[in-house]
Amino acid sequence: MKRQAWYLFLSVSLVILIVCGLSYWAFCQAMRAETNVRYSGMQSVISLQLGKTISGMEMSATNVFNEVEKHLDSPEAVIHALESESNLNPDVRGYFAAFEPNYFKEKGTWFEPYVHHTDSSKFEMTQVGSARHDYTKSPWYVRAKNIKMAFWSDPYYYYDGTNISGHYSTFVKPVFDANNNLACVCGADITFEWLGSELERINNGCRNSQQVNKYRLMRALDFYSMVLHKDGTCLIHPEDKNLPITDNKMLADLDQHNTGFVEMDVAGVPSMVFYGPIDGIDWAVAVVTPLSDLQKPFTYMAIALALLALISMIVTFVICRRI
């Protein structure tokens, strides 16, 4: 092949490589934007739906607490109010009313009736207040007494050797009598097992959504979700997928209820974590997806453009030889 043909071949090949390189760069920019929008949007939807579930729990619990407030004339009336309203939301593990010391003199210092599930359909009432369980010193009781408004307690593990032992979070609300004095602190317990099943139900809804699955772009959409406390503690996660938060920016974002994403190893798998707060509670939802799944479109497009460049250069070489 003559020198002029080589010059032509090399010039055209250079143009082909530049065009393919720019095409891949543009594709990468678009795919990164699409990935962030897709998974940030998915995280936002999961947070919103889980937040609605928690808000529904709050409304149901508030109805129970309002009934307690209407029946502060006797301890029997309080117990009846708890028992009569407990079936409104079977997902609540139990309702309690922890009264101020000697509010009912016949009940003494500690009176805390607790109406709770014994199985999937039955409730029973237990008096749990005692010198051994001095609820008046519990953080949730002290906080409710001080701030005089409803809130969610920090997650905790309760153990008493019975079937109600487990990981809990409690929606707490102070209840006042007709003279605006604190009568008791009411609470509704939810278990992390129940919340985990709700999170998985929401995840499955997202996985099977037609809108999510319409443009997979060669990805398996292999994601899962976690619930994080604002201090970085992983509250709910799939088995063997615990996420220890060590990234300072992520910890700051969780504490300040900001959204974001970060690349980190989860259970030994390089992953991308998209996180954001749940409204009304100091928790956040994190959507985790393996980097290997996110990289599939980039890998396939790089191979396709490389093959296209190679074929184009071969065709150019053949044409240049015949000139």
What would you call each of these model-derived segments?
Residues 1-33, 37-38, 305-317:
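Extreme N-terminal signal-anchor transmembrane helix of membrane signaling/transducer proteins, especially
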Residues 24-40, 46-61, 67-76, 88:
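Membrane-proximal amphipathic alpha-helices
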Residues 106, 136, 194-285:
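Intrinsic low-complexity, intrinsically disordered coil/linker regions enriched in small/polar
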Residues 139, 297, 301, 319-323:
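Juxtamembrane alpha-helical signal-transduction segment immediately C-terminal to a transmembrane helix
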Residues 164-205, 272-274, 282-293, 297:
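Conserved beta-strands of PAS-like sensory domains
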